[in-house]
Amino acid sequence: MTKHYDYIAIGGGSGGIASINRAAMYGQKCALIEAKELGGTCVNVGCVPKKVMWHAAQIREAIHMYGSDYGFDTTINKFNWETLIASRTAYIDRIHTSYENVLGKNNVDVIKGFARFVDAKTLEVNGETITADHILIATGGRPSHPNIPGVEYGIDSDGFFALPALPERVAVVGAGYIAVELAGVINGLGAKTHLFVRKHAPLRNFDPMITETLVEVMNTEGPTLHTHAIPKAVVKNADGSLTLELEDGRSETVDCLIWAIGREPANDNINLEAAGVKTNEKGYIVVDKYQNTNVEGIYAVGDNTGAVELTPVAVAAGRRLSERLFNNKPDEHLDYSNIPTVVFSHPPIGTVGLTEPQAREQYGDDQVKVYKSSFTAMYTAVTTHRQPCRMKLVCVGPEEKIVGIHGIGFGMDEMLQGFAVALKMGATKKDFDNTVAIHPTAAEEFVTMR
């Protein structure tokens, strides 16, 4: 007998879990379909394990770059990869348990398996059919790979989190935040690391101050940056090493090669055609601002829509969707403007709003005023290994409304959230000037710029 639900989410990642739990809280009969572990990319092969590894790299850097100037004996050189991975796995297991508990508390049926549409209201899972009045597609994305000879010898970000040991020599190919973060972590943990980017720099869509500072630090601390590097082929050598060959004749031999050239939607195995759901030329599901697809009763959130590919965005969109559908809020939807983001690079980056070039293009040069600060964070200033910290406020109009906040340096990852609230509320430079600084902190620079 076919089982019927009020609401079904395909995909047990951040967006699917957030939306289905919110719907269940409002008394809806709900099911969540997931073939793998709960939590999706973020919890299992993304944000969470990446952040654990980033912390590990920071600890190593604290010991070897800064420890001696703070009076510590830093001759310790032992690092146990297996211990780190065990700790990371245990932490992720606790998150899985938490998800299971909350879903159970909300009486959500968790169905293990792959879902395929039979029609716009019917799904097939594990040979059985289920129906629903509302269906959410939250299948996320997966890493992309280049179409070159030897591509199979490399791994992607998923494969990085399955490594049994830290390789001695690593090449990371890509210029986005995933490539920058992975290269930074691997370099920070002590491997000889190379980052290959297709054009002149990584993170080219960020404010130029961010990009320039990141490249400056990379040139001093690593990883080794290779610009204008277009992969041609990968050759596996007799000793098991890999040689990455570039189109211009350059090459580099490493023990591990990681593709981090971008991500693509995971929409191709759920038989969208049977439901009539439209996708664009890149395979992303087309949705409106309310997360509606072209088919009534079918919705999509997260990385499979081509929107901002960040976990909190999928969570926020999923919850707002359930508020609209099941809590009598007909206009509830996510505002995708001014979404803050952090890159867990070395040093970390925080940014929200318009870059300086974007503001000048949108408002005109005569309407834009920029405030900057460049200094050395106290954490590194008392040592011989000093690292830059740079910040920028982008303001527009006679009232100097703040439309962009950008920073790179120690502590920026934890600093940005509150300032993002201020920008979202329409704060002006005068509002920042009228705020008393917290001293001594790096954050005080944002309210003392002149």
Question: Would you name each region that the model predicts?
Answer:
Residues 2-3, 8-12, 18, 26, ...:
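Residues forming the flavin
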Residues 152-168, 251-328:
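FAD-site-proximal beta/loop scaffold in flavoenzymes
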